Design a protein with these regions (language model features):
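Defense-system signaling and execution modules centered on TIR/cGAS-STING-like, death/scaffold domains
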Residues: 1-17, 33, 110-113, 121, ...
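Winged-helix-like regulatory helical subdomains adjacent to P-loop NTPase cores
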Residues: 213-216, 220-327, 333
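The catalytic "switch" region of P-loop NTPases
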Residues: 8-10, 148-233, 238-241, 259, ...
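Conserved catalytic segments around the Walker B and adjacent sensor/switch elements
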Residues: 61-78
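Walker A/P-loop-proximal flanking segment of P-loop NTPase domains
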Residues: 1-46, 50-59, 124-126
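Switch/connector loops and helix/strand junctions flanking conserved nucleotide-binding motifs
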Residues: 48, 77-80, 179-184
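Mid-core helix/loop region of P-loop NTP-binding domains shared across ATPases and GTPases
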Residues: 88-170
């Protein structure tokens, strides 16, 4: 079966070239075994969802856990209506559970629940009746805002002491930002500025970019399947241009293999990679456009503008620096940002 380089949504091993997703998060398995709650945060399109879906499937296949990844993104439409948001969220959770888990691991029931407690009551009942320890990964957590976000975080914190018999054995929140940067408009603040509604997390993790060897191995998969080679200098140029950012690594290769060099008998050169770069810049795909939109935020401009001007960075909050790092708009180097 042919395969492609993926630039949209989670990778699927049967149709996409991909690296081992769980190899990027080896520290999570022992953390889960210790009944911990944690946060995974990284920019969009670096493989968070792919990695956590794969980990959930591996944990379930081991026979030791009931593990599933669910999303709360549908609740983003109701920032000041937690009750409506909870109902919408639980509806999508049910669909995800029925898709990813075998019937014998499904919840025995989906209780109606009390307003402001629907998430915690559902998780509590499922944990009590599950034949295995329950592990939940909650994706797109930072798509929520205001009262809905606070309500769900507090429900998770409230249930934490009852684990593992009365609440999930282990739980992870997945998003672009760490907890303190979740957006909460109430009280006049744009951010939570505290981890207190989820101060039960034991650690925060982030997913880094691909290494040069990762890029080389990913492109080699295409060579092994089709016979078309990436010249060594082409791989080096791709890594130089992308710094290993997973979406960019795949986007360059996708543009080259599907549009610029479709004849597999012709090797992929530096010129091919450079042409693909120019096409991506001109096209302004959604991922790049959304990052450009972040540059208009005041706390982003306060850091990016001095860097571009070659000036010393002013006294800015560490949280703002971490925010830019999480978004992938800057990185730590030998001489600082």
């Amino acid at each position: 079966m042919p395969k492609w380089f993926n630039t949209a949504g989670p990778c699927k091993a049967d149709i996409h070239y991909m690296l081992s997703p769980t190899a990027r998060i080896p520290a999570l398995v022992p953390l889960i075994a210790q009944q911990n709650y944690f946060v995974i945060h990284a920019p969009r399109q670096v493989g968070k969802t792919t990695a956590m879906l794969a980990l959930a499937q591996e944990l379930t296949a081991s026979g030791e856990y009931t593990a599933v990844m669910v999303s709360v993104e549908v609740g983003a439409a109701f920032p000041e209506q937690p009750d409506i948001a909870e109902g919408a969220i639980l509806g999508t959770w049910r669909s995800a559970i029925e898709h990813w888990l075998p019937a014998e691991l499904h919840p025995t029931e989906y209780p109606a629940g009390m307003e402001g407690q629907k998430i915690s009551q559902f998780l509590s009942l499922w944990a009590k009746t599950s034949p295995r320890p329950l592990v939940i990964f909650i994706d797109e957590i930072d798509s929520l805002q205001d009262q809905t976000l606070i309500s769900i975080l507090r429900q998770l914190r409230d249930g934490y002491p009852r684990r593992p018999q009365g609440f999930p054995y282990s739980l992870g929140l997945i998003g672009m930002r760490d907890v303190r940067d979740y957006k909460v408009a109430s009280g006049g603040s744009e951010r939570l500025n505290t981890a207190s509604p989820f101060n039960i997390k034991v650690r925060s993790f982030t997913l880094g970019n691909f290494s040069f060897e990762d890029v080389k191995n990913l492109y080699q998969q295409h060579t092994e399947l089709t016979g078309q080679t990436f010249l060594p200098e082409a791989v080096e140029q791709a890594f130089y241009l992308t710094d290993g950012q997973p979406w960019l690594v795949n986007a360059l290769a996708k543009e080259v293999t599907e549009y610029l060099a479709t004849d597999v008998n012709i090797p992929i050169t530096v010129d091919c990679i450079n042409q693909a770069k120019e096409i991506l810049i001109q096209r302004q795909d959604t991922h790049l456009d959304s990052l450009a939109e972040r540059l208009r935020e005041e706390r982003v401009k306060a850091i990016i503008q001095p860097i571009l001007a070659g000036q010393d960075l002013p006294d800015v909050p560490n949280d703002d620096i971490r925010y830019l790092l999480d978004l992938g708009l800057c990185k730590n180097g030998n001489q600082g940002l």
